[in-house]
């Protein structure tokens, strides 16, 4: 048998990652309806920063920030619960799949033995 030399494929070099300034420029230049802003938009959005700057009382700012924090925290807890439930579903599905594969192997084993001895 002859030995085969593996040919290495040269891949192009990766571009340098964007700088913080480039990322900020990109985000600032994106329209408000850009998916990056709308795909995970909260149901109860926090008060925009410019409205907070216009607020008369700093206490109101703190109150609005606190409300936004509590709402975000609740959404994170709900997302965590959903992830736990989905993880459990996937684990059960994996166990079911393993059980079914084992059953299929058991069913196929006698047929294979019969074919080889016959």
UniProtKB/Swiss-Prot annotation:
The modification Phosphotyrosine is found at residue 63. Residues 81-109 form a coiled coil. Transmembrane segments: none annotated. InterPro entries: UPF0449 (IPR028227). Pfam families: UPF0449. Keywords: Coiled coil, Phosphoprotein. Belongs to the UPF0449 family. This is UPF0449 protein C19orf25. It comes from Homo sapiens (Human).
């Amino acid at each position: 048998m002859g030995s085969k030399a593996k040919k290495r494929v040269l891949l192009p070099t990766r571009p340098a990652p964007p700088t913080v300034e480039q990322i900020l420029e990109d985000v600032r230049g994106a329209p408000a309806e850009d998916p990056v802003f709308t795909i995970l938009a909260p149901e109860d959005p926090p008060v925009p920063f410019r409205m907070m700057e216009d607020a008369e009382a700093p206490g109101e700012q703190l109150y609005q920030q606190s409300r936004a924090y509590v709402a975000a925290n609740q959404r994170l807890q709900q997302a965590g619960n959903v992830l736990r439930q989905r993880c459990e579903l996937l684990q059960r599905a994996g166990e079911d799949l393993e059980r079914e594969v084992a059953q299929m192997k058991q069913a196929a084993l006698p047929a294979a033995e019969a074919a080889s001895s016959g």
